[in-house]
């Protein structure tokens, strides 16, 4: 029967004449040596030119990859061998290798050797580890040596093809050939070895239009392939498939069956003469070089023929050889030590050879039989001894749940059902079948519909209008996955509805299937474990589907094909195209728990949870989180990071705080501060911001709360952390100009310090100016111009700074009035709206202030802040206070003061008598009448608690020491409301109205 292979073109790259092609064993690269002297590297998956080398000005007839060295080796008509690094594109080495054109290059698979042949009739071997010294020369041909091929089964021997009409076989270390194969009537252009172990064959192609296959042990020609109309320029045994590939100057590439020598396919891409063919080991990819470009093809499918039964016995086919491996040979200790994705150390046993080339292997449900299907035939073997049980013609073979029943697709429209290896039923379809699938029902697939038939009666159960590629049934026969090109459907099968059906339409029984869900995933291979569907995707992921959710088991770097699941080991087993068996941990208890949760059977879920190991519970917690059960996920999760995220999402700030303390991560503290702010937990938010060293957030919190102690602490901490901008701004908000100047000086910002002092602290201008001059002079020592000398000191050059003396007095005046205590109930305008000089003039005129000989202001009869009050920095502006000094104009009168107790009344009157009458501006009444303000309240922080503790310390003392006056003005229990800040007016911040608790 013919070998049925799909041929898919991956790349067609037009170029100058291609004399040699090669395929990279790892990358998806095609190497093409051109007649114009260039070498191109194409990515045949993306169809893009990756790299290009300008080798020489004459034809490059040979080029090969050396992957272990990242090299490309070329041979050209200038008799030189050149070596390039294909990553850097640099030329590593070049030397003259022959005295005539180079025809062929091969790279030894294990040794550091490159072998070249030439028109000088010589074959030479070069050692790149020994500075490319010639290791050996082989002489014996009497004409051009066209090609070399190393024996893949014995790397010490190689064959050469020559225009002297012979093929010679050589051995390293000997200068004479082992033997010569003669039979072609004209020059031999190409030669290759058979890669399988069962046939000692060599293939050759010649100018006599013939292809000959030789037995190099018997030294005889076993077959001649006649079909080409011109010279045969290239031949190849495919290393994976039972194919012989030949190319000719008649523009065709012919595919022959390697066992029957039957011509399978002829390819012609219209690119003129064929010059070279290369097949990739371990894959189904071939490359072809033509006169007008190069082509890359993919033959058949790369999925290996492999099957595993329920006991862990694995059978696979390598070419026509059947081999067996058993998972039970791995000890318990070895199994526990195996990591996910690690190759299993299995011992392989040869069972024998199949009469056909198996493209698929499949065990029966009880594992007793295994079927090999391929070449249009099937053979049923016993799984233990590989004895032939049944055979026949068939394009496809599937098993029923009953191990004694199976179905064979004999043609595109006919399916035969056999029972006990005897004909049972036959189904003649009115549609063109693309495939069949087994299971509880027999499924027939066409390009636009899917039909399910009963095995016993061959009666249609249900027709579904859907395009499907594969069908997977659960073990209990209730669930089925119908997989298409880019999605799959999960259906529930009701055997009871089918048995009790009273009406059968032309589309079968309507209630036979119920759609459970659809998922946009391209399934490559899959199987069921209970109600969980395990599958691999086109994106090389291993996932499982349970209850409408997809969970990823692993991401892999290559395509994997699932074999099955072993409950005892709790592992999913898969194989790659090179037949390496790997596994991944997947606990059955986890699947049972997730299934129970999806069914909302929480009692069962709680029972199963106790059987799940702790190291697997975090995966369960992620599943619960996706399902919306965050509280349960928090209780189950073992990952501190995951628990922190869940506690923040749930608003459980206490748990989140404890977890953040354990890790002490800035990211966690920032996240917790955001959550605490949303919950109006400002104390906690402040502590978190402090631990996270988020000085910007602390400043926002301190200014919103009006906390002077917090601002002072923030200024100190940020300065220690060298966050100078925050420290400067904090001191500026506190009105501590001296601290601001010190920060500017310490950071070398002397010009800025001088200008700030000129505006706010004239008394410090001279000292800062001296520092500025010294720094400027130091920078200009090598210059003829002294920059520092151009800076004028206002003290020495008062004529250049009119009013400087008055500004000194104003500064002293402001420093004195800032010491007057300010009630929290008074609202005052900002400093920008005040005229300090005017206030000073009025105070001097009224005699409320006088100046000493050194210019220091002295206030008369003005109360002073106590020692406790002086610990807090002064406010940026002064509030109204009974004093002979003219106070800044308030926006409104203070809130009504609580009536004093009788025993305090006399003392209060005595205090009032000692004070002068307060000057109230005329515009105050109108402002009070409207009750509006353009500036925020300024609150003297006396009893406000420090919100943020020092970094790394224990929880803060939430109530700071208060003075006697503070105790009278505020209640002992501080509340975040307008009662602390005076009456609420338009523009006031009413924290009770924020309702932050509802924002989460």
Curated annotation (Swiss-Prot):
What's an example GO cellular component term for this entry?
A: COPI vesicle coat
- Changes seen on gene knockout: Embryonic death and abnormal oocytes.
Which PROSITE patterns does the record match to this protein?
Answer: WD_REPEATS_2 (PS50082), WD_REPEATS_REGION (PS50294)
Compositionally biased tracts (Low complexity): 960-969
Annotated WD repeat ranges:
13-52, 55-94, 97-136, 140-180, 183-224, 227-266, 351-391
* Main localisation: cytoplasm
Span list, region Disordered: 863-1000
What the entry lists under InterPro entries is as follows: Beta-prop_COPA/B_2nd, Coatomer_complex_subunit, COPB2, G-protein_beta_WD-40_rep, TPR_COPA_B, WD40/YVTN_repeat-like_dom_sf, WD40_repeat_dom_sf, WD40_rpt
Report the domain of life of the source organism: Eukaryota
List the biased-composition ranges (Acidic residues). Answer: 901-915, 970-1000
**Which SUPFAM superfamilies does the record cross-reference, listed alphabetically?**
WD40 repeat-like
Q: Which keywords does UniProt give here?
A: Cytoplasm, Cytoplasmic vesicle, ER-Golgi transport, Golgi apparatus, Membrane, Protein transport, Repeat, Transport, WD repeat
Question: Protein transport as a keyword?
Answer: yes
Cell compartment(s), UniProt:
Cytoplasm; Golgi apparatus membrane; Cytoplasmic vesicle, COPI-coated vesicle membrane
* Subunit description: Oligomeric complex that consists of at least the alpha, beta, beta', gamma, delta, epsilon and zeta subunits.
Query: Which PANTHER family does the UniProt record give?
Result: COATOMER, COATOMER SUBUNIT BETA
User: Which family is this sequence assigned to?
Assistant: Belongs to the WD repeat COPB2 family.
Q: What does this protein do?
A: The coatomer is a cytosolic protein complex that binds to dilysine motifs and reversibly associates with Golgi non-clathrin-coated vesicles, which further mediate biosynthetic protein transport from the ER, via the Golgi up to the trans Golgi network. Coatomer complex is required for budding from Golgi membranes, and is essential for the retrograde Golgi-to-ER transport of dilysine-tagged proteins.
In its UniProt entry, what is this protein called? Probable coatomer subunit beta'
Species whose genome carries this gene: Caenorhabditis elegans
């Amino acid at each position: 029967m013919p070998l049925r292979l799909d041929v898919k073109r991956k790349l067609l790259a037009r170029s100058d004449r291609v004399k040699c092609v090669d395929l990279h064993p790892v990358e998806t690269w095609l190497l093409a040596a051109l007649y114009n002297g260039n070498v191109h590297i194409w990515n045949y998956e993306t169809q893009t030119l990756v790299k290009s080398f300008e080798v020489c000005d004459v034809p490059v007839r040979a080029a090969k990859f050396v992957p272990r060295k990242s090299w490309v080796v070329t041979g050209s008509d200038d008799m030189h061998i050149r070596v390039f690094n294909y990553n850097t594109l640099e030329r590593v080495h070049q030397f003259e290798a022959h005295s005539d054109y180079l025809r062929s290059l091969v790279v030894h698979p294990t040794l550091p050797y490159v072998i070249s042949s030439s028109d000088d009739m010589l074959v030479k071997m070069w050692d790149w580890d020994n500075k490319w010294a010639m290791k050996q020369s082989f002489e014996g041909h009497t004409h051009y040596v066209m090609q070399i091929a190393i024996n893949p089964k014995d790397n010490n021997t190689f064959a050469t093809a020559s225009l002297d009409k012979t093929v010679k076989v050589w051995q390293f270390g000997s200068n004479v050939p082992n033997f010569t194969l003669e039979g072609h009537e004209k020059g031999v252009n190409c030669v290759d070895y058979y890669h399988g172990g069962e046939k000692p064959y060599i293939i050759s192609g010649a100018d006599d239009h013939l292809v000959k296959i030789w037995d190099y042990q018997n030294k005889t020609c076993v077959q001649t392939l006649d079909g080409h109309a011109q010279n045969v320029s290239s031949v190849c045994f495919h290393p994976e498939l039972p194919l012989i590939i030949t190319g000719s100057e008649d523009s065709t590439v012919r595919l022959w069956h390697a066992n029957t020598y039957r011509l399978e396919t002829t390819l012609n891409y219209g690119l003129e003469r064929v010059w070279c063919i290369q097949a990739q080991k371990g894959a189904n990819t071939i490359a072809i070089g033509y006169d007008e470009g190069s082509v890359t093809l993919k033959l058949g499918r790369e999925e290996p023929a492999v099957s595993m039964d329920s006991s862990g016995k694995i059978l696979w086919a390598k070419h026509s050889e059947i081999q067996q491996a058993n998972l039970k040979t791995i000890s318990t200790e070895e199994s526990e030590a195996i990591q996910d994705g690690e190759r299993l150390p299995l011992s392989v046993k040869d069972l024998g050879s199949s009469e056909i080339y198996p493209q698929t292997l499949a065990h029966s449900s009880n594992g007793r039989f295994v079927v090999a299907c391929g070449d249009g035939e099937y053979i049923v073997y016993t799984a233990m001894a590989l004895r032939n049980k049944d055979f026949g013609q068939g394009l496809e073979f599937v098993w029923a749940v009953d191990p004694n029943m199976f179905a064979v697709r004999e043609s595109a429209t006919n399916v035969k059902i056999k029972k006990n290896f005897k004909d049972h039923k036959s189904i003649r379809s009115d549609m063109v079948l693309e495939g069949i699938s087994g299971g509880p029902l027999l499924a027939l697939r066409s390009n636009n519909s899917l039909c399910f038939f009963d095995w016993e009666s061959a009666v249609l159960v249900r027709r579904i209008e859907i395009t499907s590629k594969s069908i997977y049934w659960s073990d209990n026969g209730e669930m089925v996955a119908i997989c298409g090109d880019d999605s799959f459907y999960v259906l529930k099968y009701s055997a009871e509805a089918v048995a009790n059906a009273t009406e059968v339409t032309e589309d079968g029984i309507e209630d036979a299937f119920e759609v459970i869900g659809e998922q946009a995933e391209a399934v490559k291979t899959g199987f069921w474990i209970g109600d969980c569907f395990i599958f691999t995707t086109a994106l090389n992921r291993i996932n499982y589907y349970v209850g409408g959710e997809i969970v990823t088991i692993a991401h892999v770097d290559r395509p994997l094909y699932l074999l099955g699941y072993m409950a005892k080991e709790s592992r999913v087993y898969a194989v790659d195209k090179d037949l390496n068996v790997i596994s991944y941990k997947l606990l059955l208890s986890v699947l049972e728990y997730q299934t129970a949760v999806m069914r909302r059977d929480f009692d069962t879920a709680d029972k199963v949870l106790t059987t799940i190991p702790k190291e697997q519970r975090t995966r369960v917690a992620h599943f619960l989180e996706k399902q919306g059960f965050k509280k349960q996920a928090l209780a189950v999760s073992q990952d501190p990071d995951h628990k922190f995220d869940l506690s923040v999402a749930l608003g459980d700030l206490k748990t989140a705080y404890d977890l953040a303390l354990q890790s002490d991560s800035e990211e966690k503290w920032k996240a917790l501060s955001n959550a605490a702010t949303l919950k109006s937990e400002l104390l906690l938010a402040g502590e978190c911001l402090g631990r996270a060293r988020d000085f910007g957030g602390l400043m926002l919190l301190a200014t919103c709360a009006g906390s002077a102690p917090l601002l002072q602490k923030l200024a100190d901490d940020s300065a220690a952390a060298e966050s100078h901008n925050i420290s400067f701004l904090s001191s500026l908000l506190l009105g501590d100009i001296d601290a601001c100047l010190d920060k500017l000086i310490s950071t070398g910002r002397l010009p800025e310090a001088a200008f700030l002092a000129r505006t706010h602290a004239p008394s410090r201008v001279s000292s800062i100016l001296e520092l500025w001059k010294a720094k400027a002079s130091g920078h200009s020592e090598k210059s003829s111009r002294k920059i520092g000398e151009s800076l004028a000191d206002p003290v020495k050059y008062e004529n250049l700074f009119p009013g400087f003396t008055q500004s000194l007095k104003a500064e002293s005046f402001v420093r004195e009035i800032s010491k007057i205590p300010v009630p929290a109930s008074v609202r005052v305008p900002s400093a920008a709206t005040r005229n300090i000089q005017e206030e000073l003039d009025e105070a001097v005129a009224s005699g409320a202030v006088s100046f000493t000989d050194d210019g220091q202001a002295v206030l008369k009869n003005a109360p002073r802040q106590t020692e406790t009050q002086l610990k807090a920095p002064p406010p940026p502006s002064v509030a109204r206070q009974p004093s002979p000094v003219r106070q800044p104009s308030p926006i409104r009168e203070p809130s009504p003061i609580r009536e004093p107790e009788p025993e305090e009344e006399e003392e209060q009157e005595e205090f009032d008598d000692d004070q002068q009458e307060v000057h109230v501006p005329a515009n105050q009444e109108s402002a009070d009448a409207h009750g509006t303000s353009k500036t925020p309240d300024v609150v003297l922080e006396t009893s406000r608690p420090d919100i943020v503790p020092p970094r790394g310390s224990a929880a803060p003392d939430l109530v700071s020491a208060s003075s006697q006056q503070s105790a009278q003005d505020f209640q002992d229990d501080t509340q975040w409301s307008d009662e602390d800040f005076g009456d609420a007016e338009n523009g006031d911040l009413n924290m009770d109205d924020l309702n932050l608790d509802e924002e989460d």
